[in-house]
């Protein structure tokens, strides 16, 4: 009892001065050595299939350390933690997000760019960064990333859809509609895997923008047969910068699963499904007449290997979809190394 095996140690961190005192009080005044054991973490590899809630997973140890730091010690403690995490892009993404949460915007950008460099130009890493910028409401930066991806991969209709959504969130409604229409018009010869599904998503979301801001838009060049609305209470889509997901399920307030057999209906114009595009996952559902209460989003996650690129889910919820009073809600969820049937998000109607 009390013995420590080297095989049970995940990392060793040496803390000095304020960082050690912040964790251990007077006992840490002369410094401290922190041994991180191998245990279940939000971002620790696991290959045992199970059902669980993401919110119940413990945070990484470095997040527990940084969260007790005072503002004037934040950067110093970050630099100490970096010594044992410098090769992990996910560390920089986590730290950047927390610095932004603490209103340390300049440092957050600097840290995030370090994480982007570790992704080595990988398109999925760039999408992870764009998701982070969206979360921070820095839509211009997200737009620039999506435009760069689309220039390098013109057939990547998934990134074009991301660009259209970013324009919409930034209030550039005409550019949003134009981009959606570009997806819809994409040449038949450019079909790659599930391009047709992305065209259908583009029709849905283009009409959502038009239904809300028609008076501000020039839609004269759009085929009028494509301008139509089928309003629903909720339109939900979940996508990732990774492909290791399947089987999105939505549990209603009474615990009933969203299927085509009950009062819920599949997303307008296409059946409920999940599909992959350029190594990314996306899935969606619509609910025509939503019952009041709590909804739970569950998904099968297979990301049990450690990758250099951080893995995120982005949950897009349109309330009063394709109606003049519709509201867009977006959730960004870190999903590194999750494996199992995971409840990733909840929302109320």
Kindly give the residue locations of the regions a language model identified.
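Short, small/polar-rich motifs associated with maturation and membrane association
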Residues: 1-48
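Generic helix N-cap/helix-start motif at coil->alpha-helix transitions
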Residues: 54-56, 85-92, 119-126, 155-160, ...
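Residue at a conserved register position within TPR or TPR-like alpha-solenoid repeats
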Residues: 98-99, 133, 167, 210
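TPR/TPR-like (Sel1-like) alpha-helical repeat modules
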Residues: 151, 168, 172-192, 203-210
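Intrinsic-disorder/low-complexity signal
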Residues: 209-349
């Amino acid at each position: 009892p009390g013995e420590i095996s080297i095989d049970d140690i995940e990392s060793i961190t040496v803390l000095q001065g304020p960082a050690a005192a912040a964790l251990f009080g007077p006992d840490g005044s002369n410094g401290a050595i922190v041994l991180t054991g191998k245990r279940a973490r939000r971002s620790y590899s696991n290959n045992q299939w199970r059902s669980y809630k993401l919110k119940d997973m413990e945070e990484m140890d470095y997040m527990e350390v940084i969260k007790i730091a005072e503002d004037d010690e934040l950067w110093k403690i970050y630099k100490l933690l970096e010594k044992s995490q410098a090769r992990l892009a996910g560390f920089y993404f986590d730290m950047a997000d927390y610095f932004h949460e603490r209103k340390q915007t300049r440092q957050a950008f600097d840290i995030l760019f370090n994480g982007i460099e570790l992704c080595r130009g990988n398109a999925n890493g760039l999408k992870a960064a764009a998701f982070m910028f969206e979360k921070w409401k820095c839509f211009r930066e997200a737009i620039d990333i999506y435009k760069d991806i689309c220039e390098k991969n013109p057939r990547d209709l998934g990134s074009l859809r991301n660009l259209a959504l970013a324009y919409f969130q930034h209030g550039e409604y005409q550019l949003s509609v134009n981009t959606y229409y570009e997806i819809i018009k994409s040449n038949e010869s450019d079909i790659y895997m599930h391009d047709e599904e992305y065209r259908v998503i583009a029709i849905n979301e283009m009409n959502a923008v038009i239904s809300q801001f028609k008076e501000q838009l020039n839609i004269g060049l759009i085929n009028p047969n494509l301008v139509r609305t089928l309003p629903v209470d909720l339109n939900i889509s979940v996508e990732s910068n990774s492909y290791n997901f399947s089987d999105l399920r939505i549990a209603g307030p009474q615990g009933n699963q969203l299927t085509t057999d009950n009062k819920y209906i599949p997303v307008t114009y296409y059946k409920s499904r999940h599909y992959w595009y350029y190594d990314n996952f996306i899935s969606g559902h619509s609910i025509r007449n939503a019952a009041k209460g709590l909804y739970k989003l569950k998904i099968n996650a297979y990301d049990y290997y450690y990758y250099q690129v951080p893995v995120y889910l982005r949950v897009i919820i349109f309330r009063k979809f394709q109606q003049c009073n519709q509201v867009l809600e977006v959730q960004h969820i870190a999903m590194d190394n999750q494996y199992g049937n995971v409840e990733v998000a909840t929302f109320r109607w």
